[in-house]
Amino acid sequence: MTNPAVTLEMFLRGKLGIAQGPIALHEPWITGNAWAYVKDCLDTAWVSTGGAYVTRLESMCADICNVAFAVATVNGTTALRAALQGLGVGPGDTVLCPALTFVATANAIVHTGAVPLFVDSELGTLGMDPEAVSDVLSSRCNFADGVLRHAATGLRVAAVVPMHVFGNPVDMDRLLEVCAAYDLPIVEDAAEALGSRYKGFPCGGLAKAGILSFNGNKIVTTGGGGMILTNDAELAHRVRHLTTTARVGKGWTFDHDQVGYNDRMPNLNAALGCAQLEELPRFLALKRNLAQQYADLFGSIFVRGSNAGESNAWLNALLLNDATERDSFLEDTNAKGIQTRPAWRLISDLPMYATAPRSGSLAVARDLVERIVNIPSSAQLLAGL
């Protein structure tokens, strides 16, 4: 086919008519009731933690993700850390997570005092490979006094954290099956997957717990924010308590029963989030339309994900031949004002995680990270804005 960089430029500058100016990778679209809701916060001075918009945002997320409980936090990293802590993860534990993910996944594990154990990826989904998880648990872990431990480190295996990469759902059925055999809880890192569905069910609500991110570059933003999702009432209570300074006093008393965190989302941010969630169906329709046009345009090098999943098309991706072609593509597109990016570095290659345990060579993840590029994916691209 034609040089992918040229093909992308012709599509964006030609077909979509974006003749001048930079084209962002993914930018927020502030529309709908955003100004009215934020102004309401300013007019009433309900700008900090607490407030009707926080409660409303939690309710909206619970409905969208088909869970009973949602707890708002200040960002996705704190949401993941709190969800893990709510499940009892802490020092002396290890948590399985993909090597191909954003660094916050591993950082949140470390913030609990636990150690990440990096697992390989699956080519079809880009996410955690359930068979790699099964292999780690069966061949590199054993039960000692009824506790599942990683043999090489002696750490208790406490949880598994898959991440839905770029909004593409992981093979959750197989992963749930593998983890159920070892009674291991799963916390979905759905930071990039609001609106994605796996076999018709919303991502973030498929396991013991899930988390969302509302960073400025996500499909829906609060400026900065996160959400913990669960159907477990006790877990919801624990994480809400933990993220609100563990306060037990009422009224004017200030009693606290453990070392808690001030992870509360401000009402001002939640107001923006409520307006954004009202627009989610439109955002999804436009982004999926764009993804289909990219798929038709790029053919076999476009990353489609699994047939079992319906991505929110947060960040569209191409899978090029090798690192040389990737770097050439990135240089050519960015030089012409079209923002593209590679995937992250493998987290296991970062200096602070160089000695962390892993499932093996991470061959698939390493191959993917050398070939993936993300291309402009904003919903506005098809809205004439």
List the model feature ranges, each with a label.
Residues 11, 55-59, 67-68, 120, ...:
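PLP-dependent aminotransferase class I/II
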Residues 81-137, 161:
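Conserved PLP-anchoring active-site segment centered on the Schiff-base-forming lysine
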Residues 1-47, 375-376:
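N-terminal "arm"/small-domain region of PLP-dependent enzymes with the aminotransferase-like
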Residues 112, 181-182, 336:
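Helix C-cap/helix->beta junction micro-motif
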Residues 47-94, 108-110, 118-120, 142-152, ...:
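Phosphate-binding glycine-rich loop
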Residues 124-222, 227-229, 234, 374:
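Active-site phosphate-binding strand-loop segment of PLP-dependent enzymes
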